[in-house]
Swiss-Prot record:
Cysteines paired by S-S bonds: none
Cofactor(s) in the UniProt record: FAD
Originating species: Pseudomonas fluorescens
Top-level taxon of the source organism: Bacteria
Protein name, as recorded: Kynurenine 3-monooxygenase
GO molecular function: FAD binding; kynurenine 3-monooxygenase activity; NAD(P)H oxidase H2O2-forming activity
Pfam families: FAD_binding_3 (PF01494)
Known outcome of mutating residue 369 to D: Abolishes kynurenine 3-monooxygenase activity
Its job: Catalyzes the hydroxylation of L-kynurenine (L-Kyn) to form 3-hydroxy-L-kynurenine (L-3OHKyn). Probably required for the synthesis of quinolinic acid and the siderophore quinolobactin.
Length: 461
């Protein structure tokens, strides 16, 4: 094998969404790709019915799939969501559209189905995928890694370039931390989450809009529901693990000791949602309570030998629906740098320099978005700011672009979207202060401030 051939070998740990996408992109460009996954092949039916985990696919992720030639196949399995349907007790559900029309929507996609499409795509491009083999250790000096199966049998492999796409609890990240200081900073969240289910029959009985992301805001806690193709919905309850010290009586998972306690909680706090959850007691007891955290790293790579991407590099909370989209965007950027750079060390350094600021930005915006989803969506002040923002977007479409639109419907770098969003937020807050409706607001004066503070964007990529 020549030195050039050797330089185009890659070993990927983790056959989730980011790992399979980067495998397909590199294999299509002639790289020799070996992908290792500790779990069994999800495409092989075992008879066990897993949980239905849904993700929100936005333009960043859709663009990545488009480049990989898989967008059409994925969207055929997805459900369009035109906006947030906000449920507040005592008022009719209120649809808050995401964008101007059906060109600005997001898509609900089952994670398992998306993973299967990407696995097929990686194999079709020539990648070799090895299941039931988890990473145990990495010897960077010898460029060898050790894998093992469920029986404890160990296998040693040589690697030239190692990509860690193995999620929040990354074994590659752990191995890298033994040879370089990754600058890890973990920020745990007081909230956990629990996944529940609305059946197709229940969604039909209660006339639940199928083309929307549903939100039941409740301040310190909330429920969301994403649609499935069969008109069922995957519901997620976000709630504190423990009651805050200052509010010892506030609801938390620790108080919900079983399914019956969960039912009583839903009957009190989500009275319109509770009747839709036919299997609440069983779902609550059988589905684990998930943990949420944000992990920030200052270092993503070890020279030209190893690099992290997706959740392995930047775990984030799910409140902006961008974790998957950011990971798929990572995969595209990494493949492009590896294809164009003179050597792997240059490629990994350039990839890190490009993506780190954006990862930090979307991590911050995801944390901020919890407040918007759980509280602001039902606030009159927020709704007035949103209405004024829509008017400014119509008057100055190249200058005032709602932050949600920049994040969700464009590929403008997250860091730029965040910076512009902060300026826009301050403009709106100042403009609506002491006003209860638009009639008393000087729209021309607000527009003047928009043109003064926000340079035009010639195009949104």
């Amino acid at each position: 094998m020549t030195a050039t051939d050797n330089a185009r070998q890659v070993t990927i740990i983790g056959a989730g969404l980011a790992g399979t996408l980067v495998a397909r992109l590199l294999a299509r460009n002639g790289w020799q790709v070996n992908l290792f996954e500790r779990r069994p092949d999800p495409r092989i039916e075992t008879g066990a019915r897993g949980r239905s985990i849904n993700l929100a696919l936005a333009e960043r992720g859709a663009h990545a799939l488009r480049l990989a030639g898989l967008e059409r196949e994925v969207l055929a399995e997805a459900v369009m969501m035109r906006g947030r349907m906000v449920h507040v007790p005592g008022t009719p559900p209120n649809l808050q559209p995401y964008g101007r029309d059906d060109s600005e929507v997001i898509w609900s996609i089952n994670r398992d189905r998306l993973n299967r499409i990407l696995l097929d795509g990686a194999e079709a491009a020539g990648a070799s995928i090895h299941f039931n083999l988890g990473l145990d250790s990495v010897d960077f000096a010898r460029q060898r890694l050790t894998l093992s199966n469920v029986s404890g049998e160990r296998l040693e492999k040589r690697f030239h370039l190692l990509i860690g796409a193995d999620g929040c609890n990354s074994a590659v990240r752990q191995a890298m931390a033994s040879v370089v200081d990754l600058g890890e900073h973990l920020e745990t969240q007081p909230h956990g989450y629990k996944e529940l289910q609305i059946t197709p029959e229940a969604s039909a009985q209660f006339n639940l809009e199928p083309n929307a992301l549903h939100i039941w805001p409740h301040g310190d806690y909330m429920c969301i529901a994403l649609p499935n193709l069969d008109r069922s919905f995957t519901v997620t309850l976000f709630l504190h693990h423990q009651s805050p010290a200052a509010q010892p009586a506030s609801p938390c998972f620790a108080q919900l000791v079983d399914g019956h306690a969960a039912r009583r909680f839903f009957q009190r706090q989500f009275p319109d949602l509770s009747p839709m959850l036919d299997s609440l007691e069983q779902d609550f007891e059988h589905h684990p309570t998930g943990k949420l955290a944000t992990l920030r790293l200052t270092t993503w790579h070890v020279g030209g030998q190893a690099v992290l991407l997706g959740d392995a590099a930047h775990p984030m909370v799910p409140f902006h629906g961008q974790g998957m989209n950011c990971a798929l965007e990572d995969a595209v950027a990494l493949a492009e740098h590896l294809q164009s750079a003179a050597d792997n060390a240059s490629a990994l350094a350039a990839f890190t320099a490009q993506r780190q600021p954006d990862a930090l930005a979307i991590q911050a915006m995801a944390l901020e978005n919890y407040v918007e989803m759980s509280s602001k969506v039902a606030s009159p002040t927020y709704l007035l700011e949103r209405e004024l923002g829509q008017i400014m977007a119509q008057r100055q479409p190249t200058r005032f672009i709602p932050r949600y639109s920049m994040v969700t419907f464009s590929r403008l770098p997250y860091a730029q979207a965040m910076a512009r969003g902060q300026i826009q937020e301050q403009l709106l807050k100042f403009a609506v202060a002491n006003h209860s409706d638009l009639t008393s607001i000087n729209l021309d004066a607000v527009e003047h401030e928009v043109t003064r503070c926000l340079p035009p964007l010639s195009h949104l990529c």
